[in-house]
Amino acid sequence: MHLPNGERRLPQRVDLTEGAAHSEFAEALYISLVTLGTLGFGDVIPVDPWIRLFSPIQALTGFALLTAALSWFGQIYPALGRRRTLSIRVHLLEDNGYVETLREPEASTGNRLLEEVAASITEVRVDLTQNTETYYFRETDPRMSLAASMPYLQNLSVAARDSTVREIRADGELLQSALDDLARHFSTQFGLSGDSTGEILDHFVRDHGHAVQKET
C-alpha cells in the first residue's frame, strides 16, 4: 500500500520507505536482528503497538547479551593467562633442573621463588573458584598446560621439604599447602577422586589428557 508521502505500509505492523522489499518474514527477521544488535532502524519503522512495545525489550535483551559476552571474555582470558604463565614458569624450572638444585647441600636461600610459585597456585585456585568453566579449557601446548606441569610441581614440593636448609623446607611446606588447597578444590568442585593430594592431582593430570610422570 503506497502512502502520499512516498512510503508503503504493512497493515498494522510496520512502515516501509519507498523501495524497501515487501516480505513478512524478512521484515520480521530484520526488525529482530537490528533490535537485538542495538543498531536502530533504517527503512523499517514499527507502528503496531505490541511491536513498538516489544522492540525496546529486544534492544535491552541484545544489550544485556552483548554486555554479558564481553564481561565473560574479560574474566576468562586473564584467568587463563595467569594459569598459562604459571605453567610456563614451572616448565622453565624443569628445563633448568631446579629440583636438583634444591637437593644440593649449599642450595641458596636468598630467593623467594618457591613462595612466588605457591602464590601463583593460590591465584589459579581463586580463578577456578570465580570462573569454574576455566577448568574445562584444554591446552594444545603442553608447556602452557597446568596439568602437564603438575607432576613437576609435586617434585618441587618433595625436594624442598627434604632439603637440609631450614628456609627451603619452610618454602616447601608453603608450596605443599598451596597444592593441598588446590587438590581439595578439585575434589569438592569438580569431583576428582583420590585419597591424598597426590592422587587427586594425578587425576587432574589424566583428566586433561596428560601422563603422570613423577620422579622417584
Listing of model-derived features with the role each one plays in the protein:
Residues M1-Y30:
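Outer-pore turret/helix-boundary of cation channels
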Residues N5-R9, L66, R82, D162-E167:
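Short, solvent-exposed secondary-structure capping/transition elements
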Residues G6, V34, G62, P78, ...:
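Residue-level marker of positions within ordered structural domains that often coincide
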Residues L16-T17, Y77-T101:
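Membrane-proximal helical linkers
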Residues S23-L86:
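Pore domain of cation channels
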Residues E94-T216:
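Soluble C-terminal extramembrane regulatory/interaction domains of multi-pass membrane proteins
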